[in-house]
């Protein structure tokens, strides 16, 4: 018999990855059906990065050694893509200054993964 699960014991990293993937899919659908011009490019760019990092996060969530790296990646994808999404929806263009912060976080997540793997093997 399996123990009962509750919202307290659920895997929040998996929840974050799933919600991130849903957001990316909705952004892509919105871009395809309701937008034109430069905002479409912003939505597509955000969607691609967010969907890729959501998928990677889901895979990394199963290894305790890599979970911190996955959290960094998913946070970076949220900041990167989120800033592009809000600009596409009409927010001031200065939100574009936030986008590189998300990119740096995604890179840091990948670097974290590489360092943990190398140090684990050493």
Spell out what each predicted region is:
Residues 1-122:
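Polytopic transmembrane helical bundles with strong interfacial aromatic enrichment
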């Amino acid at each position: 018999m399996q123990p009962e699960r509750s919202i307290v014991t659920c895997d929040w990293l998996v929840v974050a990855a799933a919600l991130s993937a849903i957001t990316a899919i909705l952004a892509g659908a919105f871009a395809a059906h309701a937008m034109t011009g430069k905002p479409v490019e912003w939505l597509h760019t955000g969607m691609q990065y967010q969907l890729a990092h959501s998928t990677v996060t889901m895979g990394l969530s199963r290894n305790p050694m890599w979970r911190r790296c996955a959290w960094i990646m998913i946070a970076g994808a949220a900041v990167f893509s989120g800033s592009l999404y809000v600009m596409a929806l009409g927010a001031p263009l200065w939100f574009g200054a936030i986008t590189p912060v998300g990119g740096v976080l995604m890179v840091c997540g990948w670097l974290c993964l590489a360092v943990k793997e190398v140090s684990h093997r050493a």
